[in-house]
């Protein structure tokens, strides 16, 4: 274990359903700072790097339910799919996740660090190059990345393209739209 770098300490934390803010490294650090009466400094983020104009060249975003989704951020990029760096694969492995590729692994890493679920869409799989954030239609179905089929109703927020749901908003991306 020591030779391949799998000897780090892992803390397994059970979080109750009413504390989703603690489902990340940042959330646990914030809670620990409060408990230990220490100052918490959140990690810096830089959203100024998002280039909305370049994204619009590739994909249109149509948010149809601003009450359930007041903001939707997307970045389009041409990226070569390849293995993630070893340090990232090790951290994902320590958290019980297997490395898949650089794109999927980054979304999982962000989830672990800040608790924000994300899904990387395969551009070729998005019909009419439009992402629509809307409520599901009664009877619509989706097969997310866990490969189980779900029947949806109007109370569920989905990320869709022009023809079908491609993700369950904030939960899991669709198998039909993921990076392969």
Residues covered by each model-derived region:
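Phosphate-rich ligand and nucleic-acid binding surfaces
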Residues: 1-180
């Amino acid at each position: 274990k020591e030779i391949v770098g799998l000897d780090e300490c892992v803390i397994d934390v059970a979080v109750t359903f009413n504390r989703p803010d603690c489902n990340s490294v940042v959330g646990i650090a914030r809670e620990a700072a409060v408990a230990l009466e220490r100052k918490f400094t959140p990690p810096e983020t830089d959203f100024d790097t998002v280039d909305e104009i370049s994204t619009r060249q590739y994909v249109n975003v149509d948010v149809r339910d601003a009450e359930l989704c007041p903001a939707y951020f997307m970045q389009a990029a041409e990226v070569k799919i390849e293995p993630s760096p070893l340090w990232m694969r090790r951290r994902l492995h320590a958290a019980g996740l297997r490395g898949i590729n650089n794109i999927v692994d980054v979304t999982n890493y962000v989830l672990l660090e800040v608790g924000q679920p994300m899904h990387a869409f395969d551009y070729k799989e998005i019909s009419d190059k439009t992402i629509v954030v809307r409520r599901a239609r009664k009877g619509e179905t989706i097969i997310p990345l866990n490969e189980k089929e779900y029947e949806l109703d109007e109370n569920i927020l989905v990320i869709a393209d022009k023809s079908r749901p491609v993700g369950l908003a904030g939960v899991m991306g669709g198998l039909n739209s993921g990076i392969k």
